[in-house]
Each structure stands twice: as structure tokens, then as C-alpha cells.
């Protein structure tokens, strides 16, 4: 299921793992966004970073711009093939993809993930913003918008030739998010929500809105950072992931608030 699967990147195979953590990156991100997670994560956790078309080893493939098309492809590629418990972690756009994939599995009658961790993301029912059409901006305006998110190094944004290569995938990711149509259907699994206290793009109400997306428990964790807090606060984020897995009885000895 993960071996020789173009959708899954595992830097450190964990044959004795007790839980598998699928990680979904933000718009413009890739499996490389989680490259340093396996070495820092509890050894009982197998970190599997998702590599979507249009980036990394799949750079020559056309990116997908429809959420239903993407989750259908992911649903087939990641369909459970063993008894190892799985948890989804997604940041920003990745949170939306992880959420919709969990719902897709439920519709298909597949074993649901044991938990969903959504990070840096508005609740899906509160995502729609008709005034926000970043995927329609010209290149200069889109690069300026990326700078506002504070997730891309300024020297990269200033590299004209490199941005010419990256912008089509970034634009496709924004189209994926901005064309998303929400339909209410709460999950039957626990959710944990991670958010930055200084995130200018997400309000506390939009964070708390995730509670309506599950019939199970929903825990909210705040971090002292902006929209991309998962990078500078990596160790704190990973420690909170581990405690959350313990809270869900997937890791022993790590139960915590």
C-alpha cells in the first residue's frame, strides 16, 4: 500500500510501527514539507508524507484542481491494506484534503482513520470567500499574496526563473481550495485542531467551527505563531501530535491534554 506508491513518501520505514501518520501539505507544498518529521517523531509512528501530482518526484504530472477528483485518486491510492491504525495530519489546504479524504473513505465503507488532525485551516463550512480568487491573479500579484502568508522565503519569491516553474502548481492548489463546495456530513472520529495565535487569515470562530464536523470529541491546540507555525515550532507541533495520539490510545505513555 505504501511501497512503490507514487502518492506516498516514507523517509524512514518503520516496520514495527503502531500507528501510521499520513501528512498532507499546504498549497504549493509537497512531501518535502515533512522531510524532517520522521527523525523527530516517536519511533512507533510511521510518517508517510503525501506527494500530490505537480511537485517533487511527480513534478511533470499535471496538478489536480478538483477536490472530488483528488480525493477519489487518494482514496484508491491509500485504501487501507493492513490493520495498522491510521491518522491524517493536514496543514492549511492539506487539512481540507485530509478531511474530505476521511469522508470519502466513510462513503466507500472503508475503515475510517482513527483520528484527524487539522492545522492552520478554517472549518470547511467557513472556507467560502467569494472575494478571494488567488488562482485568478496574475503572476506578480500571486507572488505578492504568497509573501503575505509568510510561508515562502523572500529570496525564493524573488527568483524569477524558479517561480515560473512553481507558480502553475501553486495556482492549481489555490484553485483546488477556492472551488471547493462544502456539504455537511459530520465524521464519526475524533478531531484535533492546531492553530497559530497570530494567524491573520483564520479567526477563533473559524477554528472552533471544526467542532461541528465530528460527532466525536474535538480538541483545540493553540501555538504562538502565524499561519506557518508548523515550521518554526516543529518540535512543539510534533510533541502535541504525539500527545494527541496518546490521548486517542494509539501511543502508550503519552496521554496528555
Where does each model-flagged region fall?
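Domain-scale detector for complete catalytic domains at protein termini or as standalone homologs
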Residues: 1-89, 96-257
Amino acid at each position: 500500500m505504501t511501497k512503490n506508491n507514487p502518492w506516498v513518501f516514507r523517509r524512514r520505514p518503520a516496520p514495527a510501527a503502531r500507528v501510521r501518520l499520513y501528512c498532507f501539505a499546504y498549497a504549493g507544498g509537497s512531501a518535502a514539507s515533512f522531510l524532517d518529521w520522521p527523525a523527530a517523531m516517536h519511533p512507533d509512528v510511521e510518517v508517510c508524507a503525501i506527494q500530490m501530482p505537480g511537485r517533487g518526484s511527480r513534478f511533470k504530472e499535471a496538478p489536480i484542481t478538483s477536490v472530488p477528483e483528488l480525493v477519489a485518486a487518494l482514496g484508491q491510492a491509500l485504501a487501507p491494506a493492513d490493520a495498522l491504525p491510521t491518522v491524517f495530519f493536514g496543514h492549511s489546504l492539506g487539512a481540507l484534503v485530509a478531511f474530505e479524504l476521511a469522508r470519502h473513505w466513510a462513503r466507500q465503507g472503508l475503515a475510517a482513520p482513527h483520528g484527524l488532525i487539522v492545522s492552520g485551516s478554517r472549518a470547511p463550512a467557513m472556507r467560502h470567500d467569494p472575494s478571494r480568487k488567488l488562482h485568478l491573479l496574475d503572476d506578480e500579484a500571486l507572488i505578492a499574496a504568497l509573501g503575505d502568508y509568510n510561508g515562502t522565503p523572500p529570496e525564493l519569491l524573488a527568483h524569477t526563473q524558479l517561480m515560473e516553474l512553481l507558480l502553475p502548481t501553486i495556482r492549481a492548489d489555490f484553485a483546488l481550495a477556492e472551488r471547493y463546495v462544502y456539504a455537511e456530513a459530520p465524521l464519526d472520529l475524533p478531531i484535533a485542531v492546531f492553530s497559530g495565535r497570530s494567524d491573520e487569515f483564520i479567526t477563533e470562530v473559524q477554528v472552533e467551527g471544526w467542532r461541528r464536523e465530528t460527532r466525536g470529541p474535538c480538541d483545540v491546540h493553540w501555538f504562538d505563531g502565524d499561519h506557518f507555525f508548523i515550521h518554526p515550532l516543529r518540535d512543539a507541533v510534533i510533541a502535541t501530535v504525539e500527545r494527541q495520539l496518546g490521548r486517542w490510545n494509539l501511543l502508550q505513555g503519552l496521554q496528555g491534554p
